[in-house]
Structures are given as structure tokens and as C-alpha cells.
Amino acid sequence: MFQPAGHGQDWAMEGPRDGLKKERLVDDRHDSGLDSMKDEDYEQMVKELREIRLQPQEAPLAAEPWKQQLTEDGDSFLHLAIIHEEKTLTMEVIGQVKGDLAFLNFQNNLQQTPLHLAVITNQPGIAEALLKAGCDPELRDFRGNTPLHLACEQGCLASVAVLTQTCTPQHLHSVLQATNYNGHTCLHLASIHGYLGIVEHLVTLGADVNAQEPCNGRTALHLAVDLQNPDLVSLLLKCGADVNRVTYQGYSPYQLTWGRPSTRIQQQLGQLTLENLQTLPESEDEESYDTESEFTEDELPYDDCVFGGQRLTL
């Protein structure tokens, strides 16, 4: 028969011995690491721990439902507030999401960030707030344009000033050198649209006045000649544009003046351009046409053509 009393007695007899064993194990556990680390090693470890700096990371997409809601065009709540020019609401949203770079730099279906839209809608104050909150000025839209490209294309000097003065020097250098998917820098776009104030401002900030677009190798000065803009030509020359820089086909800005109405541009460039870059190169087709005065014996035209049973007279 099973006797509970007997087992209780056995447990009582073994109790003190087990308690002593447990006490020894605890003592061993506490003392096992004693003197395992020297003082100098400990001090070095403390020093290294103090020098650890956590790297800032982009905040993950927040769990708030309004942050995750998108339209069919991929616009977030912030995109829509900027599009509809709800400035008070926009500033409130920016204040709430400050530091959430994933949300601030979110791109819609046209790859436009809120900063792109602030420039497109001509809201430089909103653009400044977005930049201070952490928006990236180097992100590109579906045409490869940064927000500064758009500001130069639209001729908005206020937006250009905000974008160039609020961003960091590293961002500014990168944006000034960046080309869109047509190969145009911000300076090219400002030149194409004839915004002289923006051109001068960009060059002052360090934009390369002799940068060549990749399609034909034209500089801003070549573009100014193409557009027949004498004031832009004068400004670019004042800013140090190279009059002897040639396109990929070998044409100087002066050579592009031939056959064009502005004699003022031709006079401006003619005084500075090398002599060998002033005359147009002769076309190979024209040379071959001029030297070919008569047909050779093997190249005489046919004189026995028959069409519909009738002899043709050439």
C-alpha cells in the first residue's frame, strides 16, 4: 500500500542535505567569475562602451492609419495637403511627422515627393519647412528632375533661393551637378527658358558654366546661341563661359551663329573665338558633289529605258 506518511518522512530527512547543496551551487555561481577580468581590461571596456554612438536611422513607417492611406495616384495625406495649398494643415502635418524621413520623402506614382509638389505649386515657405524637417532635395521625379530642376524650369527665384540656401553644402553640390533624364543640369534649364537671374545665381553658387549636355555636347552658351538670346550670351561670357568649347560634332558657339539673324551675338563671340573655330567646316557631301563634274564611262545614264512598250527619252 502506498503510505504518504512514509514519503513525507523521507523528504524531511533529505531536506537539509539538499538545502546545503543548493547553497554551495549559488556560492559557486556567484564566485565563478571572480578576478577573471583585470582592472585595465575593465577600464578599456568601459571606455569603449562610452564611445559607442548610435547611428541615426530613418523612422519606420508609423502605424497611424492616416499615414498609410494613399490615393490611386499614390499621393499621401501630405501630398494632397500641398496640392490643394492647405498651408495651415500642411504645416501641422509636417510638425507631426518631423523626423519620419520615410513619410516625408515618400514618392507618388510620378515619383514626386512632397518637396517636388511644393515647388510645382509655388509654395517656397512649405518647401523650406519640408527641408528643415528632413526632406531629401536630391530625389528625382519620373523625368529625372530634382526639385531644383523644377524651380529653374518654372523660373521661380524664391523657390530656387530656398532650395539652395536651406539644404546642406553636400546636397547643394550634388544637385548643381545632377542631370535629368534629358541630360540637362539646372543651369541648362534656366538657360533654355531664359531666366537670367537664376543663371547668375546658380553660377555664383558653383554651377559648372561649361557643363555639356550628353546628347550633342552643347554648353549653356551653345544653347543661348540656339535660342538667339544676346543678353544671356553676355551674362554667360561675364560668368566665364568658354567660347572655344565645341560640341561633339566640333562646332563652337560662334559657328552656330551662321545663318541666324542676331548679328549682335556674332559680334560678341567673334572677338573672343579662335580663328579656326569661326569658319564652318566644309561638308564632305558638298566636296564630293563639287569634284564630280561628269559621269565616268561606267556611270553614263541609261538611254534605252522602255515603259509600257514606249521608249523613254531622257
Swiss-Prot record:
Cite the repeat ranges for ANK: 110-139, 143-172, 182-211, 216-245
- GO cellular component annotations of the record: cytoplasm; cytosol; I-kappaB/NF-kappaB complex; nucleus; protein-containing complex
What ranges does the record give for the region Disordered, renumbered to this chain?
Answer: 1-39
* Keywords per UniProt: ANK repeat, Cytoplasm, Hydroxylation, Isopeptide bond, Nucleus, Phosphoprotein, Repeat, Ubl conjugation
Which segment of this protein is annotated as the motif Nuclear export signal?
45-54
Question: Do you know what upregulates this one?
Answer: During liver regeneration.
Q: Tell me which Pfam families the record gives.
A: Ank_2, Ank_5
Where exactly is the Glycyl lysine isopeptide (Lys-Gly) (interchain with G-Cter in ubiquitin) cross-link placed along the chain? K21, K22
Q: Kindly give the SUPFAM superfamilies that the UniProt entry links to this protein.
A: Ankyrin repeat
Q: What InterPro entries does the record tag this protein with?
A: Ankyrin_rpt, Ankyrin_rpt-contain_sf, NF-kappa-B_inhibitor
Q: Where does this protein reside within or beyond the cell?
A: Cytoplasm; Nucleus
Residues modified as (3S)-3-hydroxyasparagine are: N210, N244
Record-listed Phosphotyrosine modification sites: Y42
For molecular function, the Gene Ontology terms on record are: enzyme binding; heat shock protein binding; identical protein binding; NF-kappaB binding; nuclear localization sequence binding; protein sequestering activity; protein-containing complex binding; transcription regulator inhibitor activity
Q: Where is the composition biased (Basic and acidic residues)?
A: 15-39
Q: Where is this cross-link: Glycyl lysine isopeptide (Lys-Gly) (interchain with G-Cter in SUMO)?
A: K21
Motif Nuclear import signal — list its residue ranges. Answer: 110-120
Sites bearing Phosphothreonine, chain numbering: T291, T296
Which residues are annotated as modified residue Phosphoserine in the UniProt record? S32, S36, S283, S288, S293
Any one Gene Ontology biological process term? Answer: canonical NF-kappaB signal transduction
Q: Return the similarity comment.
A: Belongs to the NF-kappa-B inhibitor family.
What is the purpose of this protein?
A: Inhibits the activity of dimeric NF-kappa-B/REL complexes by trapping REL (RELA/p65 and NFKB1/p50) dimers in the cytoplasm by masking their nuclear localization signals. On cellular stimulation by immune and pro-inflammatory responses, becomes phosphorylated promoting ubiquitination and degradation, enabling the dimeric RELA to translocate to the nucleus and activate transcription.
Give the quaternary structure: Interacts with RELA; the interaction requires the nuclear import signal. Part of a 70-90 kDa complex at least consisting of CHUK, IKBKB, NFKBIA, RELA, ELP1 and MAP3K14. Interacts with NKIRAS1 and NKIRAS2. Interacts with RWDD3; the interaction enhances sumoylation. Interacts with PRMT2. Interacts with PRKACA in platelets; this interaction is disrupted by thrombin and collagen. Interacts with MEFV. Interacts with DDRGK1; positively regulates NFKBIA phosphorylation and degradation.
Q: What is this protein called?
A: NF-kappa-B inhibitor alpha
Organism from which the protein derives = Rattus norvegicus
Lineage of origin: Eukaryota, Metazoa, Chordata, Craniata, Vertebrata
**What gene name does this entry carry?**
Nfkbia
